[in-house]
């Protein structure tokens, strides 16, 4: 009896010991696997990994964002109507643009600088920082900024005027993106930046000749890249025609973007400061203008302001004027006849019916565009 009891106790101890050894062995293996996993570089399960999931509370929808989504980029030389364009798109319930990020053109310019320097290119390649690595990092950075600096929406757009100096590169990073290149009479753009003291890197605001020369160089760079990616990806939008005939141009533009028509794009001024509407910056120079409905008040303000010697040499100083369809010697120019509604809007603007709302009243800083 005692012998049988000892035998049972011995068997029980053996079973317990076996289970304990098995458990400890399994635990050790799990720890080893976890250590190995942590030592491996992080891998994305999906090459189209979502940067952000945004929730539209009102519509009870969740949106996911990735590099293959149909992003919209608005650009051009500053003072060419880029803010008006983004405000009109922002009024659409399915589109969110938001204020200028300012960081996007700077990081793109940095990437261009690295690419142009053969010595720097060799150094980066030797360090394993290849074009593929940089492009992947740029995709993630740009998308993160575009997505997270505003509210979620089915369609996202970015408006940083000089970002389109890297238009072909952006088209490669985001294969389904569309580009809107805002074009304006260079004489009007330059007069606006000089009279409103909008400092732009490289532009001498004391010289119409210098500013027109720099305007010509900048718009030529963006225009050539727009032509390179083709009409299916890039659309030229003449500021003058947009303000003269907004409905015609917005219908054409939304069709180009494959976004359904919505009448609210013609009344962006009614959506300012509203949820899901147009968010404006207190420090951007165009804010006091886009609070007003589309009007023709700014079209010919440059007439009589440009020095005679510059006017005489205009075709040589700014050959892109003629290429874009402007008469370099027309003074004043004839941009066309506005729609009746625009004439009414302009009359109301001149009467002073539209004033800067209190929540936007803050003295603007000196704005510099790079």
From Swiss-Prot:
Keyword Transferase found: yes
Keywords assigned: Disulfide bond, Glycoprotein, Golgi apparatus, Membrane, Signal-anchor, Transferase, Transmembrane, Transmembrane helix
Molecular functions per Gene Ontology: protein homodimerization activity; protein-tyrosine sulfotransferase activity
Record EC number: 2.8.2.20
Residue ranges crossing the lipid bilayer per the database entry: 9-25
Topological category with respect to the lipid bilayer: Single-pass type II membrane protein
Expression by tissue: Ubiquitous. Detected in heart, brain, lung, liver, spleen, kidney, skeletal muscle and testis.
Annotated family: Belongs to the protein sulfotransferase family.
Entry function: Catalyzes the O-sulfation of tyrosine residues within acidic motifs of polypeptides, using 3'-phosphoadenylyl sulfate (PAPS) as cosubstrate.
Assembly mode: Homodimer. Can also form heterodimers with TPST2.
Full protein name: Protein-tyrosine sulfotransferase 1
Protein's organism: Mus musculus (Mouse)
Gene: Tpst1
